[in-house]
Amino acid sequence: MARSKFERKKPHVNIGTIGHVDHGKTTLTAAISATLSTLGSTAAKKFDEIDAAPEEKARGITINTAHVEYETDNRHYAHVDCPGHADYVKNMITGAAQMDGAILVVSAADGPMPQTREHILLAKQVGVPTLVVFLNKEDQVDDEELLELVELEGRELLSQYDFPGDDIPFVAGSALLALEAVTKNTSIKKGEDKWVDKIFSLMEAVDTYIPTPERDVDKTFLMAVEDVFSITGRGTVATGRIERGIIKVGDTIEIVGLRETRTTTITGLEMFQKTLEEGLAGDNIGILLRGVQKKDIERGMVLAKPGTITPHTQFEAEVYILTKEEGGRHTPFFPGYRPQFYVRTTDVTGTINQFTADDGTDAEMVMPGDRIKMTAELINAIAIEQGMRFAIREGGRTVGAGVVSKILK
């Protein structure tokens, strides 16, 4: 019966390494990859392969990210690592590589640094739900008390940003020494090298402490409307990609955003010119709606399970503003700035009223390349929820990206 073990689908989790530059994020990624490759299910990725992260585009922004996959006995992981600090900021805000949890890397020799703080704040704002901490470069710390001090400081910092600082697992080790040991002996086993064992301990903490995320199909139904047309004798069809959940013929849904919310029943589902009984997250589908005129529904509205999403006009968001080189603005902007907010499938005009710096003070203006917290008000109410991503556009070009951190109204 031993065979079946390899056929089971392990739960999939997306994680990443975050933390201050030069504290060893990429080395740790390589060390995890190499260590877990000794278990035989995934090939090791070398440091250079991870460091030469390819460019990708998300919401009109170019980001360098490396994707590494590996498996523990319990799970399959997709791990994202970014070479530069700006790439992290952009990745976390655009959600280009979604993270269900993250490993915060802190150098045991240096302790938490400014970017450590910034990444914890960002993780909180953009909704990375769970963190595990790796205290790297333990081999450079002779004094046990110093290690305890760094851990204490790390826990306080996490609590400050509303993470459960007392409960988060901290694992100390050396990514470099573990990587060297595995590179020398690729069939190394648990118990043969203390540094490699610490990587196994870290992954045990990740396995147990970072929860398996709810799959998209298990969430409540939502689809943003991309197009609307009428079929003579049958009614109005809204097309789009199902963002989450499952939809069946006969289900009652709400049409939310831009106008009064209204309820309707689904009388048919079509995909690739064929009728279906149900649609799942990820499907591009046409939904036939009972008693709805073509003029009643438009691109930018969403179809959703009743009571699960509501229209709003005011929210706080964490945003990244593109530099001139990235194709963004050449000049700063000030409170009162009125761009378009591209949300799901449509642009809505809004006013940016206020900017707040990380230390809580008001900022007078925002420069290209800045990351800032802002308050915005849209001219039309649309379906908005916490953690939702959007682009900021001006005359059709992207000048920034954001994520809703709080709904105000």
From Swiss-Prot:
Region (G1): 19-26
Leading EC class: hydrolase
Region annotation G5: where it falls in the sequence: 174-176
Catalyzed chemical reaction(s): GTP + H2O = GDP + phosphate + H(+)
GO terms of molecular function: GTP binding; GTPase activity; translation elongation factor activity
GO cellular component term, pick one: chloroplast
Listed EC numbers: 3.6.5.3
Region annotated G3, chain positions: 81-84
Annotated region (G2), positions in chain: 60-64
Family that this chain belongs to: Belongs to the TRAFAC class translation factor GTPase superfamily. Classic translation factor GTPase family. EF-Tu/EF-1A subfamily.
Chain ranges of the tr-type G domain: 10-214
NCBIfam families per the UniProt record, alphabetical: EF-Tu (TIGR00485), PRK00049.1 (NF000766), PRK12735.1 (NF009372), PRK12736.1 (NF009373), small_GTP (TIGR00231)
Major location category of this protein: plastid
One of the Pfam families matching this protein, by short name: GTP_EFTU_D3
UniProt-annotated stretches for the region G4: 136-139
Name of this chain's protein: Elongation factor Tu, chloroplastic
Its job: GTP hydrolase that promotes the GTP-dependent binding of aminoacyl-tRNA to the A-site of ribosomes during protein biosynthesis.
Residues reported in the UniProt entry to bind GTP: 19-26, 81-85, 136-139
Disulfide bonds: none
UniProt binding sites for Mg(2+): 26
Cellular location(s): Plastid, Chloroplast
Sorted UniProt keywords: Chloroplast, Elongation factor, GTP-binding, Hydrolase, Magnesium, Metal-binding, Nucleotide-binding, Plastid, Protein biosynthesis
